Amino acid sequence: MNCEDMVKIPELENVLLLRAGAGGMKNIVRWIYFADCLQCVQSEYKVEDYIHGGEFVILTNRSVTDNKDTLIGLIGKMLAHGISALGINEGQISDELIQYADGNDLPLFELPEKYPLIDLFQILCNKL
């Protein structure tokens, strides 16, 4: 499945709002990775231990998303290891992040803050 296919899933019609990175909508999504754990941004852990390529990465932890430099640095490392797309809660997407995603053809999806992520995971995993 690619990013274009994800947005065509009827149950996700009002869930995945593309905010940037339209040039990467053909990126293949192999799996979903929920990257809110703080350990994935601490220096003793390596992104490559968690990212293997083709992931749709979900980040909703404000302690990560509110720090623009940390967030863009983390996304850059994940991009180097082949992530396919990024999902971040509404209200947590900065203009800098939109520019970064557009510049890297990384589909950036805004997620409704109140939408149960378990539902998103189940729907997408059943399609994968």
Spans of model-derived segments:
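Alpha-helical/coil-rich non-catalytic "connector" segments in signaling and regulatory proteins
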Residues: 1-128
